[in-house]
Amino acid sequence: SISLVGDSPDTERNTAKKRLISGEIRFIFVVDIYNEGVDIPAVNTVLFLRPTESLTIFLQQLGRGLRLADNKECLTVLDFIGQANKKYNFEEKFAALLSNTNHSVQYELKNGFVSVPKGCYIQLEKKAAQHILDNIKSSFSNKSGLISRISTFEEDSDLPLNLSNFAGYYHLDIRTIYSKFSFSRLSVLAGVKADFDEEVEDVLTRAFARIVAIDSRRWISFLLDILPRLDNVDFSALGAVEQRMLQMFYITVWQKAAEDWNSDEVLENLYSLADSPVMLSELIELLQYNYSRIDFIDEPVELGFDCPLDLHCTYTRDQLLVALDYMTPSNIREGVKWLPEKQLDVLLVTLNKSDKDYSPTTMYKDYSINESLFHWQSQSTTSDISPTGQRYIHHRQRGSQVLLFVREFKTDIAGTAPYTFLGTADYLRHTGSRPMNIIWRLNRPIPAKFIKKTNKLIVG
């Protein structure tokens, strides 16, 4: 073996790669080099011998061994975990390897990392696993860990404390904050923000877990425009699509629809938000953060009326149903809803169903076949000759539309998981009856970022 550092002689650095590939040496130990720009596909073992603070560098170092090569069956990664600084973030390193799960890193660690990519395996010694669990518990996964990080953030980062800087510096999934807390209250408890007493704090803190998933540019832009001037808006004079977007926001925060924009209760709730400058400011900052993170193209879907739902955006059940003028979404217990006034069939699909959440008669087999075709199983009581089955089959001739909303799991780390709107779909064919197995043809293809999740049940 040899060791290389930044000031090693050029001749030694230039010959090291050939000597490793030829087998003349078995290991190259490096410090602060080989992070990027070095390609040695034959590398089949990577050792991490000290903590790496930068997530980017960690992934670059791991990537040195991820190339395919002849006679290379796998990559073995040995990460020797020492007594690292208590602020060292193990959680983000494992989260980067677990991008296809809605479970927490703690859950994955305790259950053997069941969600790592196919062909991968993570094994930890018992003491190392406990050390990482302790690190995570003292880091971002609990109140005291968040408060500790917030209290020293500006000193640690040389950045002003705000939500965007905090999440970016620590590579943080902000759902870990908003599953239970508000950033403003945590900042007060950390001693870096003046205390406040606002009427809307409790209800908005609970709503943040739902607001954190909003990713429609059109909806966010509307909210950013109207929220700062709530006490100077005639809500009943808003246009149809704007009223629907405000309705979606109202049910997100107060968990019920606004039946009348001029009712005392509705106005009192909206004005209480206008009278809560600290929480309103955080709400606006969260929406701005969400907007900055959108990485796909969203667009309106033509449904025959001014509908605020946009293609490939994320919505809770309540949000999407009030957007379609169905004002009592809590009454729905199944994953289907026929809206005769709008001539719409709404299909709410959960791909990965657990036995404890679904009965044997509701464990439907739902998955995408490719980017344009989706296999969907109807309710177990729906036959192909029933009025519902006939409506599915002949919806185009009858002038109705089918809307497909899909989520991977029932819950995520923020609570109840929202749905992704895959747009309208047309009946192609079916087999069976009670239940019907229908193949829908989507009118817009599923983007690559979603297809890996929607077809996972048939490719693995």
What feature does the model see in each segment?
Residues 240-346, 351-354:
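Charge-dense, extended regions
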Residues 51-98:
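Conserved segment of the helicase C-terminal RecA-like domain
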Residues 1-35:
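Conserved helicase ATPase core of P-loop NTP-dependent helicases/translocases
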